[in-house]
Amino acid sequence: DRRQRQMCIRDSSWADAVTVQERLIRAGRGPKRPGDPDFSGPMNYAYHFDAARFADYLRDISIAAGVTRIEGTVATTERAPDGDIAALMLTDGRRVAGGFFLDCSGFSALLIGKTLGAGLTSCADYLFNDRALALQLPYDCPDAPVRPYTLATAQDAGWTWDIGLSERRGIGYVYSSRHCSDEDAEATLRRYLGPQGAALAPRALRFETGYRETQWIGNCVALGLSAGFFEPLESTGIMLIEAALKMIGDFLVPADRSAREAAARSFNRLMTGRFERIVHFLKLHYCITRRTDTAYWRDNADPASIPQDLQDMLAQWRRRPPSRFDFVVDLETFLPPSYHYILYGMGFETRLAAGERRYPGAREAHEAFARVRAAQTGALGALPDHRSLLNHYHARMGTAPAKVSR
């Protein structure tokens, strides 16, 4: 019986064994049914939204809540005698005074970097990618299938993303300039696109992977790109923004400088920990690769490019599964299940030191795998085609797809 269970699991991919989603996405199914309540459904799912329209939405609800919107371009900053930022001077001569500032100025880091001098800790020794090419590829016909997942494909010096939206696909190639010229990168992207993309010109992006260890200085906190950046991973950036805002809301005590300085130290320690753990999680995608065909993948697997803490965890995970004690919950953006998916989805082998006897949950796991297989069959019959589901919501909202994807 035990041998049969092992053979059954070996015949399945990790994703197929532990999730219902694997079979559903390959069948082109959407994550919910038209009659399900908004923002919920039988499958976990995320959104690709129009960033410009979402920004307009946030602007409108903020103004309705009493926020004053001032539109302008920052020219310089004015410092107070104690070193705090006293005001922003705009290019049109206006002065915007404030008691506390959030630096959302992106890569330029106008306040936290250029004014207050917080340096950027580079992660280039661990995470090699520093450039990207991106473009939008329209569908051939309006009713073309919409892939219900993001497709990431390993390339010689990086990876391509391929995101299916209502009217188009968003496609790009993120790569390491140390391992690939810009010309070779564009050639790789064009091979991926095929003839459909021959007339399209990709947009080139350059970035430095890293983060600021002091994201809160005085009366200023960096948020978003001014705090740090890891590849084109918008969802990770949004999670970090939310985590920072929640901490600021809890930590900030008005009119108490000593409490504010203590809060800044706590905030910087916690956010630095989060960024460090994200470095480990991202590096995990690369360092356990079995590819050895290009210098990019060989360098990624070189122990010299793997943070020591991650090396220590991998050494243990080769003899036991990840434990909740490997993770400091308050510092984690990615929790243990995320590590399971990367490790075992990429074929990482854990040879249990004492076999299954040491792990009393092994039998329950096999029973759970059987329940997953049964649920897969039911879900395939219950969930609609992804394009049909999107068309349903566009019709319900009275909005044409072209209005909601750019």
What are the roles of these predicted feature ranges?
Residues 10-49:
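Alpha-helix-centered segments that form part of catalytic cores
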Residues 80-86, 214-218, 290-291:
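A short, glycine/Asx- and small/polar-enriched loop/turn
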Residues 154-206, 226-239, 251-257:
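Conserved FAD/dinucleotide-binding core of flavoprotein oxidoreductases
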Residues 20, 46, 156-157, 168-169, ...:
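Extended, composition-driven regions rather than compact fold-specific motifs
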Residues 37-188, 245:
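Predominantly flavin-linked oxidoreductase catalytic cores and closely associated redox partners
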Residues 1-9:
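Single conserved hydrophobic/aromatic residue that forms the stacking wall/gate
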Residues 250-406:
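Long, low-complexity C-terminal extensions of enzymes
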Residues 204-222, 228:
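FAD-binding beta-loop-beta segment adjacent to the flavin cofactor pocket
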